[in-house]
Amino acid sequence: MSLSLNEYLRYGRQLIVPEFGLQGQISLKNSRVLVVGAGGLGCPALQYLVGAGFGTVGIVDHDTVDISNLHRQILHTSETVEMLKCESAKLQLAKLNPLVQINTHPVALSPDNSFGIFEQYDIILDCTDTPATRYLINDTAVLLGLTVISGSGLKTEGQLSILNFNNTGPCYRCFYPTPPPPSSVTACSDGGVLGPVIGIMGVMMALEAIKVVSGYYLREDVEFQPFLSLYSGYGPLQSLRTFKMRRRSPKCRVCNAGTREITRHVIETELDYAVWCGKMDYNVLEKDERVSVEQLSAQRAPYLVDVRAKEQYSIVHLPNSINIPLNALKHMDTLDVPKETMIYVICRFGNDSQLAVKHLKSIGYENCVDVIGGLTQWSRQIDPNFPIY
């Protein structure tokens, strides 16, 4: 398949790059790339993949656009809030490059559909942020022989790697045979993220996809070496460090044929990724250990402990509340109040406050309750002028 006159004009500036050239462009045109997740990573990656001229670009995302996404998910706009993210992204991408076929898959990726979707593509970009989905993407891609470009970003840092390169490189399970404890996994809704940081990682993912598909890593003068790139946006200077990673694990349960335990049949019929990866159980209190925001509002001067991180507390908080971040509270064996004090505990959503109450009871503070729904519910039911972030 050759290029049209329009394509020569559109892609001319990258055609003359020595490392890329005409054959690189033709390879992109003949390739089908799937981006799982049209969020902070997926949006910039999609823009550059479509701009570069991949023949077919697929988008998997069942979520809808929220106004809190817009500072970093730059394909979406105020006008597309509440629209499916994959459809919102397609609207903008079609304007950017009408020569690219854009397919949308408005579903939650699952063992029931991952193989059917992935079989339509040649390379996968993992732009998700949950361990369960990362393992599913990895396992499906490995069993189909697909390369995965994997990225992530949180707060001011990001990382990037290429998995199962050319069906010979190490996979996600080679590096992480077992999932991390649920308590150690922080989503950007909890830990925060700066838009440019996640944007840089998404752009880097697109570049690696271009390099893989155009054949750069298969050149005689280039030897692919598994790597992990770590980006830091803060400090005196921005930094990007790249580390060589080990090759395939001889004990891997999916990419090593000799030790393979995970097959397509196992994934589609037996393996529950959400259960295997675990999930934080926040429903740890009895009904009488919880109160509504209306009940809290009825108290004249409650002893109110806000267990959010200090950065969040400084954004907005209820008057007369005391800030003791959950991580600090877990290491405390006493408070500056008598054990019989009635203590109300609040957080952002009503999850961490339950864990805090459980700890307080374990150190002797029996008269403590958490506030259901946290400050978010307070804004909805009590004070609509209280900011939600």
Swiss-Prot record:
Pfam families: Rhodanese, ThiF. Coiled coil: none annotated. One of its GO terms (biological process) is tRNA wobble position uridine thiolation. Its main location: cytoplasm. Keywords: ATP-binding, Cytoplasm, Metal-binding, Molybdenum cofactor biosynthesis, Multifunctional enzyme, Nucleotide-binding, Nucleotidyltransferase, Transferase, tRNA processing, Ubl conjugation pathway, Zinc. One of its GO terms (molecular function) is adenylyltransferase activity. CDD domains: ThiF_MoeB_HesA_family. Pathway: tRNA modification; 5-methoxycarbonylmethyl-2-thiouridine-tRNA biosynthesis; Cofactor biosynthesis; molybdopterin biosynthesis. It is found in: Cytoplasm, Cytosol. GO terms for cellular component: cytosol. Binds 1 zinc ion per subunit. The active site is at 188 (glycyl thioester intermediate), 347 (cysteine persulfide intermediate). It catalyses: [molybdopterin-synthase sulfur-carrier protein]-C-terminal Gly-Gly + ATP + H(+) = [molybdopterin-synthase sulfur-carrier protein]-C-terminal Gly-Gly-AMP + diphosphate; [molybdopterin-synthase sulfur-carrier protein]-C-terminal Gly-Gly-AMP + S-sulfanyl-L-cysteinyl-[cysteine desulfurase] + AH2 = [molybdopterin-synthase sulfur-carrier protein]-C-terminal-Gly-aminoethanethioate + L-cysteinyl-[cysteine desulfurase] + A + AMP + 2 H(+). It comes from the Eukaryota. Zn(2+) binds at residues 171, 174, 252, 255. Its EC number is 2.7.7.80, 2.8.1.11. Its cofactor is Zn(2+). Residues 298-387 form the Rhodanese domain. ATP binds at residues 40, 61, 68-72, 85, 129-130. It is an enzyme of class 2 (transferase). Plays a central role in 2-thiolation of mcm(5)S(2)U at tRNA wobble positions of cytosolic tRNA(Lys), tRNA(Glu) and tRNA(Gln). Also essential during biosynthesis of the molybdenum cofactor. Acts by mediating the C-terminal thiocarboxylation of sulfur carriers URM1 and CNX5/MOCS2A. Its N-terminus first activates urm1 and mocs2a as acyl-adenylates (-COAMP), then the persulfide sulfur on the catalytic cysteine is transferred to URM1 and CNX5/MOCS2A to form thiocarboxylation (-COSH) of their C-terminus. In the N-terminal section; belongs to the HesA/MoeB/ThiF family. UBA4 subfamily. This is Adenylyltransferase and sulfurtransferase uba4.
